[in-house]
Amino acid sequence: MELTKTVKDKTFDDYFTEVDHSESISEDRPGSMRLFYLNVRSGKIKIADLEKFTMLNIGRYVFSRAKQEQYEKAGNLDVVMQQALRIMRKRGAADAKGTGNELGEIMIYAFLEEKLKAYKLLSKIELSTDAAQYLSEADGIHFLCSDGTSGSYNQMVFGASNIVGEIKDAIDQAFEIIKKISAHEDDEVYMIEKTVLDRFYDEDDLAVLKEYVVPEEGKKAKYAISYGVFLGYNFGILPSGRSDDELLDIMQEKLEQDAQQHAAYISQKIKDCGLENHAFYFYLLPLNDAETEKKTIMQHVLDGDVDL
């Protein structure tokens, strides 16, 4: 049993390519550090692809499964994107902290669903609107069902994200979010128990939630707490005079080096926070100019100014 996926099918791998590496951030617990890159055009990372991917999934990020079903039954699926953007604009400006309008908050939603198969309970925009009274510290909350393999178990995955120029700064700032989530873990779980059933309509989804997340009185919930982290950062200057294919090879080599240089640092941060007993799932994506582009992308999305 597992929850239904919400990220739009057949979009992720059209835009993101994963880099293979052998580094580990966890010796004893499940966990991973996965690095991805976008396509390159005319010597630069193709940010337009990130805008398009974000826009194609915006309704699924903003609305619960139950709300999307209401639109579908009413024959109004064609207005979901428009209504999602309307809600985001009412929440605040592009890239405004804590509103659900940050690029990293959307990326952690997408990466956890697509690559971890930890499906959405509440995204950041839902946490900041429908569940605002609970003051969640998370950038999204997902649920990963056991697949029955050795060492696999049900996990409630709390999301954190940061996009900033230096990768080490992004790591540090993401762990500040994680520490806040950990300190309020009981409150976060209480919020899920009080709100999550209203966000689903599918009987199979509800069966999963009632079995593992919000069990009947007298039964215990069946999951561990884990963390999913999205980090965006500056790639650096791509060398001139190279073809785009050559630049993609250079990017792969650089990302392998990034993995080697920062895996041990992430592992130590986990230990410093006293969270060694939790699984961590990191997703890293370089940009040309992270600080500028995260704002530009979200401004284009909120304005509806994205070519699809």
Model-derived features: positions:
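Glycine- and acidic-residue-rich phosphate-binding/metal-coordinating active-site segment common to enzymes
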Residues: 120-121, 128-210
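A structured, charge-rich N-terminal accessory region that forms the first stable segment of a protein
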Residues: 2-83
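Short acidic, S/G/P-rich loop/turn micro-motifs used as interaction or catalytic elements
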Residues: 43-44, 164-166, 235-239, 290
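A short, highly charged nucleic-acid-interacting micro-segment common to nuclease
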Residues: 85-109
